[in-house]
């Protein structure tokens, strides 16, 4: 019986290891240029931001309570870093959230950074983004320097690790990002297919 338990434990640990490795392999290392329109129908390309010291891409939602819990934090981080050469791009890829809803949500929540609509979740698919909010920090060559969560708690008062801020501070100091990957948490992106 003991040997059976050890055998089953070994299988479980091996499966867990492969699942973890597979999840890590799913992260993109470099983004491709893309074109999307914002809620005012203005077209943007990722390359429009190539002169930035860092480009923060945040997959966001209007209806997700987790993403909405981060609205004020996203805006605070944007305000803190916008004059330091950091570009911010919000991307809404949820099929059920219209451009008008995205526009209204941005105005209601005072989100002043660029917010683009990914109509057929093409960009979410290319980034392999799974949830909202989910962050990708790129350099001017579109290499992914950080991927994951904004911080470690849905409740602002419980935050212990400000992962996005930490990554941005290291980038702006010319350092290598210490923690390049964290687990993003939130609502799944509602895809077309």
Please tell me what each predicted stretch does:
Residues 68-109, 116-126:
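Structural microenvironment flanking redox-active thiols in thiol-disulfide oxidoreductases
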Residues 1-26:
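Bacterial Sec-dependent N-terminal signal peptides
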Residues 105-149:
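Short, internal strand/loop/helix patches
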Residues 34-54:
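A short beta-strand-turn-helix
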Residues 47-68, 168:
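Short active-site neighborhood of thiol/selenol oxidoreductases, capturing the structured segment around
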